[in-house]
C-alpha cells in the first residue's frame, strides 16, 4: 500500500474510538485530514460529535465535510484528541509541528482526556530527532533567540543547524503569527530535558516535543495491518 492509503487505514481505525456525543480535538496535517473526511461521512450518517480544530485549515475542512466545530472557550474539556505526528519515539514521545500548528496542537492535546496518534509505520523511530524539531518563537529578537537556542543545545551536547522556516521569500508564519525555527539536531535522547531547557529561553513560545501527552498510537503497517502502541505507565 502507498503512503496515502496507509494514512486512510490509520484514520479509519481511529474512528472506532469515537463514540456518539464525544467532544473531539481534531488535529492538523495530511493524516488528520483523512480522519476529518471519514469523520464527515460518519456525521452524515447520524454520528453526533463536536470538534475543536488545531488549525485554520483543519477547521475549514471540518466545515466543508459537515463536522461541527467550536472553540476551547465554549468547550474547555475534550474527550479525545486525534492527531498525526512527524515522529513517534519511545513511550509515546513525539515530534510534531511540521505543518506549523504545534502550539494549538499542544493546547488541544492538554485539554483532552486522551490523545490518540494516527500514523504509518515510517513515523515510528527508536530515537527522536531525524525530523527537524520545530520551535515556535516570537518575531521580536529573532537573532537573540536563535543564539540562545544554539547555546542551550551545545550545552546539552546537541549539534546541527537551527534555521528559520521560510514561505517563499518571507518567513513562515503560524496561524498565531509566530515564526518557526527548525532545529536539525539528529538524535534527541532526552526529550523531557530538552523540552524544559527550551522553555527557559525568552522568545520561545512552544516547541514540537510532545512528552507525556499521547497515550496510544494507531500505526498502519506497510501490508495494511494495524499495530497499536501504548504509553507505559
Swiss-Prot record:
Pathway listed for it is: Carbohydrate degradation; pentose phosphate pathway; D-ribose 5-phosphate from D-ribulose 5-phosphate (non-oxidative stage): step 1/1
Give the function comment from the record.
Catalyzes the reversible conversion of ribose-5-phosphate to ribulose 5-phosphate.
Q: SMART domains of this UniProt entry?
A: DeoRC
In the UniProt record, which is one GO cellular component term? cytosol
- What family does this chain come from, according to its entry? Belongs to the ribose 5-phosphate isomerase family.
What are the alphabetically sorted keywords of the record? Isomerase
Q: Which InterPro entries match?
A: NagB/RpiA_transferase-like (IPR037171), Ribose5P_isomerase_typA_subgr (IPR020672), Ribose5P_isomerase_type_A (IPR004788)
Q: What quaternary arrangement does the UniProt entry report? A: Homodimer.
User: What Pfam families is this protein classified in?
Assistant: Rib_5-P_isom_A
* Entries under SUPFAM superfamilies matching the protein: D-ribose-5-phosphate isomerase (RpiA), lid domain, NagB/RpiA/CoA transferase-like
Binding-site residues, substrate: 28-31, 83-86, 96-99, 123
Catalytic reactions on record: aldehydo-D-ribose 5-phosphate = D-ribulose 5-phosphate
Q: Enzyme group, top EC level?
A: isomerase
Q: Name one GO biological process term.
A: D-ribose metabolic process
Catalytic activity, EC = 5.3.1.6
Q: Name one GO molecular function term.
A: ribose-5-phosphate isomerase activity
> Which residues are catalytic?
105 (proton acceptor)
- Could you identify this protein by its name? Ribose-5-phosphate isomerase A
Amino acid at each position: 500500500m502507498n503512503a496515502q492509503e496507509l494514512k486512510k487505514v490509520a484514520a479509519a481505525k481511529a474512528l472506532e474510538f469515537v463514540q456518539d456525543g464525544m467532544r473531539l480535538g481534531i488535529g492538523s496535517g495530511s493524516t488528520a485530514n483523512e480522519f476529518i473526511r471519514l469523520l464527515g461521512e460518519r456525521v452524515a450518517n447520524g454520528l453526533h460529535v463536536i470538534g475543536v480544530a488545531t488549525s485554520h485549515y483543519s477547521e475549514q475542512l471540518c466545515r466543508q465535510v459537515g463536522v461541527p466545530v467550536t472553540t476551547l472557550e465554549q468547550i474547555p474539556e475534550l474527550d479525545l484528541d486525534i492527531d498525526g505526528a512527524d515522529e513517534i519515539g519511545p513511550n509515546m514521545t513525539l515530534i510534531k509541528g511540521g505543518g506549523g500548528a504545534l502550539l494549538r496542537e499542544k493546547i488541544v492535546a492538554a485539554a483532552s482526556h486522551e490523545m490518540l496518534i494516527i500514523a504509518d509505520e515510517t513515523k515510528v523511530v527508536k530515537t527522536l530527532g531525524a525530523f527537524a524539531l520545530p520551535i515556535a518563537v516570537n518575531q521580536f529578537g529573532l537573532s537573540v533567540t536563535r543564539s540562545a537556542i544554539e547555546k542551550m543545545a551545545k550545552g546539552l551536547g546537541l549539534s546541527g543547524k537551527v534555521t528559520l522556516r521560510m514561505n517563499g521569500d518571507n518567513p513562515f508564519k503560524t496561524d498565531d503569527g509566530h515564526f518557526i525555527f527548525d532545529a536539525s539536531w539528529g538524535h534527541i535522547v532526552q526529550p523531557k530535558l530538552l523540552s524544559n531547557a527550551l522553555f527557559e529561553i525568552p522568545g520561545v513560545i512552544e516547541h514540537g516535543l510532545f512528552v507525556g501527552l499521547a497515550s496510544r498510537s494507531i500505526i498502519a503497517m506497510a501490508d495494511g495491518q494495524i499495530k497499536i502502541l501504548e504509553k507505559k505507565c
